[in-house]
Amino acid sequence: MNLRDFFVITTWWGKILGAFFGYLTAGPVGALFGILVGNFFDRGLVSYYSNPHWLYHAEKQRIVQKAFFEATFSIMGHVAKSDGRVSEQEISMAKSIMNEMKLSKGQKDLAKRLFNEGKQADFNVSLALIQLQRICKDNRDLLKLFVDIQYRAAQVDGLSSQKIHALDNIFTHLGFAPLHKQYRFYEDFGSYFQQEQSKQHYHNQQEYKHTSSSQGQQGYKPQSPPNTLAHAFALLEVSPNANKQEVRRAYRRLLSRNHPDKLIAQGLPEEMIKLANDKTHQIMKAYELICETKGW
């Protein structure tokens, strides 16, 4: 007998407990009053657990959890293989995420199988992302956590152009801006960005080396990644010119949206609670940095 059947079929617990505690408190009169209160309690439980929406939401949550778990590791394998080779660092990162989630042996075996499936050339990444987006379309905070996990795994041994293309594909399928517009990732993305711009600068110098030195000095200069403070504002999703109240509201809103209990209610597998806590910690550190820098 499951929890729903217990409360639907067994409808007298409230009356018994009400009568017992009522009798202890006020004797026979208290027992009668306790039965009355317990009856309302029983009726409320029966009404709640008999409601078909309860069963629907419970089933939907299980579907979301399954889809999120499967997509997390299969897409992770796809991104790792996107540049042709899965490095030891990427394998270690995948194992680290499994350990953080405190997966059982069976769950780890499933996660490894999904990771390997994602590495295969015939893996249909578009179909996997479409299914995830369809199932989690009402849980955008879950999807944001999903892309955060994928980015974290992808950048462990450096971002290549192939990985960035794979990440952009993930982001756009799920309704997010491409990586170069995801300001909250710039702190890590900046090193790759500088390298690519330096290569382009060198290429321009070689291509136009026959021009005058003054013209050569006017060539393209690599851009520096934004500073840590700008990254903190980006994490809180506010403008660097935002005032104290705007920053505080954004901070509280993000804490609420990324609260582990809320994400679990939306369908986040309980094994991924550690990853949600990491996201909350990043938000808190960003807010602390802004307040300290601004003197708030």
Swiss-Prot record:
It is found in: Cell inner membrane. SMART domains: DnaJ. NCBIfam families: PRK09430.1. Its main location: membrane. It is a single-pass type III membrane protein. This is Co-chaperone protein DjlA. The chain crosses the membrane at residues 16-39.
